[in-house]
């Protein structure tokens, strides 16, 4: 039997691997979502306080352009007046920037937790490697980021130009109004333009959130070799070994159950054992066991098979032999080829019957199992 070594990251990550991954500062939180939240809440804050901001700005502008000879002849008065205006500007925008800082900090903490990553501060000469830098520069991740940035720039430009073109004359005639009306109308023009930009960016943010989730979990996945290496690294503690073994069993069982819909046939005991077989004549040298179980697991395999329209056939001695002498992901033992071939031939006849109709093919009877593989010692079913 051939055993292909597959080094693709197909295994679910262990708890230890997830912790190490998070320590590196990796997170599934979308920066695009954070930017959108900043824009939404920042604009909302400006909208709620627009009248007070406009009033204070009008006061500052009026006092700034008001000519006063006493101020000009006294240098101290000039300094005091300057700091007075600075203070007024800070008072006007302090609530806005305070709220904005909270929005910048709080969402990443809620979604990703508090992380202090000092790894990037360490001196690493490998970063000076030109080939490594070029490889990173032309990576798929960089391409995705470039595509997102270009798309955002295109959307923002189109919306801004279109909106300003529509309201061109309204903006042009702002200079003919009094200062209060001009500031308020100008604020409204900018605000509604930003609302349209937010609506245009929402699809990009949604796609980025799903992309971040998929990319994060893809990076988290491990190869068989990584799991073995981690097990060797941490095998000093019996509790950790037991926990890792348990996690590996859970991961294997989940993957096994998810593979059941791919099976061609389920061979059962009928209630104590269930073995799911798959055979691709173009890709496989022999039928392969993709799932097996006893008790509750066997019943679950049969339930999934019924739900997906997979053929189920009862052959107690063959089911016991396959369970005992076969491993998940491996080909069946050579001595069982003949027995399994009879069942697969029946499965193919059933598939043909479903397509063309006619007489339903009779199930194979007296499926023989070699005595050396017969678990209970019976010769036939």
Swiss-Prot record:
GO terms for cellular component: plasma membrane. One of its GO terms (biological process) is bacterial-type flagellum assembly. It is a multi-pass membrane protein. Residues 1-21 are annotated as: Disordered. It is found in: Cell membrane. InterPro entries: FlhB, T3SS_substrate_exporter, T3SS_substrate_exporter_C. The keyword Transcription regulation does not apply. Keywords: Bacterial flagellum biogenesis, Bacterial flagellum protein export, Cell membrane, Membrane, Protein transport, Transmembrane, Transmembrane helix, Transport. The keyword Cell wall biogenesis/degradation does not apply. The chain crosses the membrane at residues 35-55, 89-109, 153-173, 187-207. Residues 1-16 have a biased composition (Basic and acidic residues). Belongs to the type III secretion exporter family. NCBIfam families: flhB. Required for formation of the rod structure in the basal body of the flagellar apparatus. Together with FliI and FliH, may constitute the export apparatus of flagellin. This is Flagellar biosynthetic protein FlhB. It comes from Buchnera aphidicola subsp. Schizaphis graminum (strain Sg).
């Amino acid at each position: 039997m051939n055993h292909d070594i597959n080094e693709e990251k197909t295994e679910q990550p262990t708890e230890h691997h997830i912790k190490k991954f998070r320590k590196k500062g990796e997170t599934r939180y979308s920066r695009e979502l954070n930017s959108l939240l900043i824009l939404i809440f920042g604009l909302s804050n400006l909208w709620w306080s627009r009248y007070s901001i406009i009033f204070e700005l009008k006061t500052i502008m009026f006092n700034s352009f008001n000519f006063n000879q006493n101020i000009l002849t006294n240098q101290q008065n000039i300094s005091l007046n300057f700091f007075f205006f600075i203070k007024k500007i800070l008072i006007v925008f302090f609530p806005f920037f305070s709220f904005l800082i909270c929005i910048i900090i709080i969402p990443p903490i809620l979604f990703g937790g508090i992380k202090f990553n000092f790894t990037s501060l360490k001196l690493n000469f490998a970063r000076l490697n030109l080939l490594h830098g070029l490889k990173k520069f032309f990576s798929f991740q960089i391409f995705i980021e470039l595509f997102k940035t270009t798309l955002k720039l295109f959307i923002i430009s189109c919306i801004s130009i279109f909106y300003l073109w529509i309201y061109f004359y309204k903006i042009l005639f702002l200079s003919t109004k009094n200062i209060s009306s001009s500031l308020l109308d100008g604020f409204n023009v900018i605000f509604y333009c930003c609302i349209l930009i937010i609506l245009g960016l929402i699809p990009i943010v949604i796609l980025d959130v799903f992309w971040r989730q998929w990319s994060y979990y893809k990076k988290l996945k491990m190869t068989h070799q990584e799991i073995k290496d981690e097990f060797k690294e941490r095998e000093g503690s019996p509790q950790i070994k037991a926990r890792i073994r348990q996690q590996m069993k859970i991961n294997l069982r989940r993957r096994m159950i998810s593979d059941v819909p791919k099976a061609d046939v389920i061979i059962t005991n009928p209630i104590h054992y269930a073995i799911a077989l798959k055979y691709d004549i173009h890709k496989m040298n022999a039928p392969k066991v993709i799932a097996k179980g006893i008790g509750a697991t066997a019943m679950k395999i049969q339930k999934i098979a019924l739900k997906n329209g997979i053929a189920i056939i009862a052959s107690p001695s063959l089911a016991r032999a396959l369970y005992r002498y076969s491993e998940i992901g491996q080909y069946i033992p050579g001595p069982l080829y003949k027995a399994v071939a009879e069942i697969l031939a029946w499965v193919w006849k059933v598939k043909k019957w479903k397509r063309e109709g006619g007489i339903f093919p009779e199930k194979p009877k007296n499926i023989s199992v070699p005595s050396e593989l017969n678990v209970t010692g019976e010769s036939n079913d």
